[in-house]
Design a protein with these regions (language model features):
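Feature captures the FAD/FMN-dependent oxidoreductase FAD-binding
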Residues: 31-115
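Short aromatic-enriched loop/helix-cap "lid" or pocket-rim segments at secondary-structure transitions
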Residues: 2-3, 13-14, 72-75, 114, ...
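Short, well-ordered coil/turn elements that cap or connect secondary structure elements
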Residues: 4, 55, 61, 130-133
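Short, surface-exposed linear patches
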Residues: 10-14, 23-24, 82-84, 90, ...
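Glycine-rich active-site loop/strand segments that organize a redox cofactor
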Residues: 3-47, 139, 143-146
């Protein structure tokens, strides 16, 4: 997240703070930011995720790769009472050991920052995209840096996409 700390979220504080997490944070003296405000990634990390990780303590696990998340006793076809079932999370640890964990809540913070979509609408790279790789940026640039600003100053720039990141790049 530190890589995109300069990016304003497209969701408000009211949408990115989970009520259960807020209850967990209440005894720590944490106060909910303005629900209507749109935080930057860095604000969200510093003001919410880090305090939440502290409140969760040793329940936060690191050094493992999540292979998949589902609901206990349910598959993609059986959806009756799906929301009432605990999550089952399959992880692989750095030493190769696999583990199955059960949870009432899962925070998915994986995002798409490291796996951006290619430019062609089919999900494949556009013709010529690989050849132009040195002139393509797949992330919202941090324009506070002089070198980054110089890269774009006085040039025509195409912003490809219809998602929030494309809009944020223009904002």
């Amino acid at each position: 997240m530190r890589e995109w700390s300069h990016v304003r979220l497209f969701s408000t504080w009211g949408e990115v703070v989970d009520p259960a997490a807020e209850r967990l944070l209440a005894p720590t003296g944490w106060t909910h930011p303005d629900s209507a405000a749109y935080p930057f990634g860095g604000d969200w990390a510093e003001s919410y995720l880090l305090p939440l990780a502290g409140a969760l303590g040793d329940r936060v696990r690191t050094g493992a790769t999540v292979i998949g998340v589902s609901r206990t006793g349910r598959d993609r076809i059986v959806d009756a009472d799906r929301e009432q079932q605990p999550f089952v999370v399959r992880v692989t640890h750095a030493d190769g050991r696999e583990e199955r964990l059960f949870a009432r809540a899962v925070i998915d913070a994986s995002g798409t920052w490291v796996t951006p979509s290619p430019a062609d609408g089919s999900g494949l790279p556009a013709l010529g995209e690989k050849a132009a790789a040195d002139r393509i940026t797949y992330r919202v640039p941090d324009l506070k840096g002089q070198a980054i600003r110089a890269r774009y100053a006085g040039k025509r720039t195409a912003v490809i996409g219809s998602g929030a990141s494309a809009f944020t790049a223009l904002a």
